[in-house]
């Protein structure tokens, strides 16, 4: 006969309670970690802002106000702005050399320090649609990034090294590629949210990275350009008055979902690269501190400095070892030392040389220093 559950049953819910507690604890831990990360980023940003000079803080404030005004204007006049974009894209599409012009612009922004790759990518989607726009953008970006890589590898190598050393992320990822320049690692790196043109120049400074591997990685990661094409294509459709509000709402949601998915994907890939970098640190392949790689010139006058005495070196710059402590118990060494002392005293009596007890030099080889000596040495004269 089945037993009915009761409040006195000690086994009721025995398995469910620990599982529930474990799930809640893990969820709470994840939430706390994310909140700590957000607070940490905010505090780091604030500390960085306060460490800047007055003119730079003023410039940042002006840029922040300008961006806020632009956002407000877009929210108010978004319909007129989208319609203007549609008109411009239609005129561009009607140009005889429109495709060549867009190809040239995308090709050129592959060379650092030029910017504007994202805007041109969305423009390709607005003007030429999803499929045609992606083909044009992929060809221009792959060829532009590869040519930029070759130019900075063979003609502007010193400039490429400066670009790599100017960014902490570039330095970290370059150390990974120096140890493992496989195609898989480079593909993950190309999917990370790094500046497009700057990464082309910085990666050229890594001699272990083959040009063919770089070209293949750019080719394999070209489908990610569909995100920019899709967003640009949907932005143009928002300006089409023939479509209903429900269609516009779907377009807006699709843009938001696409952007969120792309951000999440790049965030996950970036975290994977950070964990791989940490793995290299744990194995000791890559030094954890940049000061180990590039040198640390701070605290030159710290207490860790070793104070050397010139009397500790002979004329050939070899350190004179102190053997007194090691051979103090050796009978042969003690007898030999006594003979040297007696011989030196006999020579002194005969006037062959004169011993100065205040010059800080152990003339007899006894390892004892005069109390009035200002030098601390175990060296002796060689006659």
UniProtKB/Swiss-Prot annotation:
Residues 353-362 have a biased composition (Acidic residues). The chain crosses the membrane at residues 58-78, 100-120, 134-156, 214-233, 249-269. It is found in: Golgi apparatus membrane. It is a multi-pass membrane protein. Keywords: Golgi apparatus, Membrane, Transmembrane, Transmembrane helix. One of its GO terms (biological process) is mitotic spindle elongation. Residues 125-235 are annotated as: VTT domain. It comes from the Eukaryota. The keyword Transmembrane applies. GO terms for cellular component: Golgi membrane. Residues 1-22, 345-383 are annotated as: Disordered. Residues 1-10, 370-383 have a biased composition (Polar residues). Golgi membrane protein involved in vesicular trafficking and spindle migration. The VTT domain was previously called the SNARE-assoc domain. As there is no evidence that this domain associates with SNARE proteins, it was renamed as VMP1, TMEM41, and TVP38 (VTT) domain. Belongs to the TVP38/TMEM64 family. This is Golgi apparatus membrane protein TVP38. It comes from Debaryomyces hansenii (strain ATCC 36239 / CBS 767 / BCRC 21394 / JCM 1990 / NBRC 0083 / IGC 2968). The lineage of its organism: Eukaryota, Fungi, Dikarya, Ascomycota, Saccharomycotina.
């Amino acid at each position: 006969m089945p037993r009915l559950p009761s409040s006195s049953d000690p086994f009721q819910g025995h398995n469910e309670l620990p599982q529930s507690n474990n799930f809640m604890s893990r969820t709470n831990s994840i939430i706390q970690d994310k909140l700590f990360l957000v607070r940490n980023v905010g505090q780091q940003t604030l500390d960085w802002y306060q460490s800047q000079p007055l003119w730079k803080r003023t410039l940042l404030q002006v840029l922040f106000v300008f961006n806020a005004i632009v956002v407000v204007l877009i929210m108010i006049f978004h319909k007129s702005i989208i319609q203007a974009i549609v008109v411009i894209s239609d005129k561009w599409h009607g140009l005889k050399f429109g495709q060549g012009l867009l190809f040239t612009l995308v090709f050129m922004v592959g060379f650092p320090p030029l910017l504007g790759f994202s805007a041109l990518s969305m423009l390709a989607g607005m003007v030429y649609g999803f499929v045609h726009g992606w083909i044009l953008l992929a060809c221009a970006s792959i060829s532009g990034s590869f040519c930029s890589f070759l130019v900075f590898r063979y003609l502007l190598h010193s400039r490429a090294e400066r670009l790599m050393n100017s960014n902490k992320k570039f330095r970290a990822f370059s150390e990974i590629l120096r140890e493992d320049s496989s195609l898989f690692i480079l593909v993950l790196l190309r999917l990370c949210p790094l500046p497009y043109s700057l990464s082309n120049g910085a990666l050229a400074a890594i001699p272990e990275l083959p040009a063919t591997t770089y070209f293949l990685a750019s080719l394999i990661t070209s489908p990610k350009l569909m995100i920019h094409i899709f967003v640009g294509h949907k932005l143009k459709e928002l300006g089409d008055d023939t479509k209903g509000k429900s269609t516009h709402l779907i377009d807006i949601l699709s843009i938001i979902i696409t952007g969120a998915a792309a951000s999440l994907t790049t965030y996950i890939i970036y975290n994977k690269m950070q964990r791989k970098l940490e793995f290299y640190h744990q194995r000791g392949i890559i030094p954890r501190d940049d000061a180990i790689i590039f040198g640390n010139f701070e605290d030159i006058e710290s207490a860790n400095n070793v104070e050397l005495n010139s009397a500790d070196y002979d004329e050939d710059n070899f350190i004179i070892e102190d053997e007194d402590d090691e051979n103090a118990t050796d009978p042969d060494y003690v007898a030999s030392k006594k003979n040297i002392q007696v011989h030196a005293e006999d020579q002194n009596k005969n006037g062959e040389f004169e011993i100065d007890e205040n010059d800080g030099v152990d003339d007899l080889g006894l390892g004892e220093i005069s109390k009035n000596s200002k030098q601390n040495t175990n060296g002796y004269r060689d006659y």
